[in-house]
Amino acid sequence: MITVNGPTLTSGSNTVTAMPATTSGVHGISQFGLNLKLNTTATSTTPVGAEVSPAANGTNYRGQAKANYNTVDNFKFTTGDGVADSANGGAGGSDAQIFTVSYIVNVPGSQPAGTYTTTLTYICTPTF
């Protein structure tokens, strides 16, 4: 299981609202979210992100993005959420994979100017 932990973007007391449910980005509203997919040009002028590599294929049971973080052009952020898991019940290894995280940020015109930052920690907990 891989979890993401940390706060949403902040600049002093100003914040960008975390996306509590999986949804697409909407220009002009406060949103901060992430996913583990290769996103299309619906979110930017060029595709952003990547698929988990190598992918699970029903035989190797490698890790994969979890629900809420595995839909193209849809994003979510809740600290403590599991974003990826092998869920193979000990049926085999799931090593040597590359996970790429894509982030989205949208703000309204009324968002106070500033340098918005966050520190996110990804924790991988192995199970045997």
What do the predicted segments below correspond to?
Residues 1-128:
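Signature of Gram-negative chaperone-usher
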